[in-house]
Amino acid sequence: MPQNEYMEEHRKRHGRRLDYEEKKRKRTAREAHKASADAQKIFGHKAKLHHARRHAEKVQMKKTLKAHDERNVKQKDDGAVKEGALPAYLLDRDGQKDAKALSSAVKDRRKDRAAKYSVPLPKVRGIAEEEMFKVIKTGKSKSKSWKRMVNKATFVGEGFTRKPVKLERFIRPMGLRMTKANVTHPELKTTFQLPILGVKKNPQSPLYTSLGVLTKGTILEVNVSELGMVTTGGKVVWSKYAQITNNPENDGCINSVLLV
């Protein structure tokens, strides 16, 4: 047994290898690939134990993420103020456990803002799942069919990174990804090509909204800073909503009307 911390002592005296950080980064990046390869090789009782351990890890991860999300939830705290500690004119106020309650309320209001506009296309044709998705066969013998490829145009954002192959259920092809939209101003009767900031609401399904699918009637958020629009208070308007009026997958472009 070693009597001293000779490894730490050597590190303090001479430092680490010059490529230590790079090697560590690459090793960490390959861990997911190694875990995937190991999971495919093992079988029998060892595989059962491995899957049970991974399942427990994922459950714990979900609980941790949920705990982080609950910090932003507005909750009434009855024990914050004791009886008789407040003057009469403050008794109607509730104690708040979370300081982020106001910001959460603002975010929720922003989410529902798309419903307040009278849109050019109030009704659109429903799209069947067979038309929206193509089934992708996977596995060694192509017997698994849990993956789907989106047949419609999509928007994924600038910092988008695909999930690992084992976890990516919905594939959005590069050729159908859109970043700009032709936006027509209804009052000026002029058309501008503006960058898309996000998909606010797809009338077909919340799933299509989360995937960023662009179909006829979808509400987009576009960057209107080039138009020089200002609010009544004199502030510059950076983004506004627009509704798609064509079928982007057929035309190869997005035509939309600005909601003013």
From Swiss-Prot:
One of its GO terms (cellular component) is preribosome, large subunit precursor. GO terms for biological process: maturation of 5.8S rRNA; maturation of 5.8S rRNA from tricistronic rRNA transcript (SSU-rRNA, 5.8S rRNA, LSU-rRNA); maturation of LSU-rRNA; maturation of LSU-rRNA from tricistronic rRNA transcript (SSU-rRNA, 5.8S rRNA, LSU-rRNA). Residues 17-36, 66-79 have a biased composition (Basic and acidic residues). It is found in: Nucleus, Nucleolus. Disulfide bonds: none annotated. Residues 1-37, 60-79 are annotated as: Disordered. Involved in the biogenesis of the 60S ribosomal subunit. May play a part in the quality control of pre-60S particles. This is Ribosome biogenesis protein NSA2. It comes from Cryptococcus neoformans var. neoformans serotype D (strain JEC21 / ATCC MYA-565). The lineage of its organism: Eukaryota, Fungi, Dikarya, Basidiomycota, Agaricomycotina.
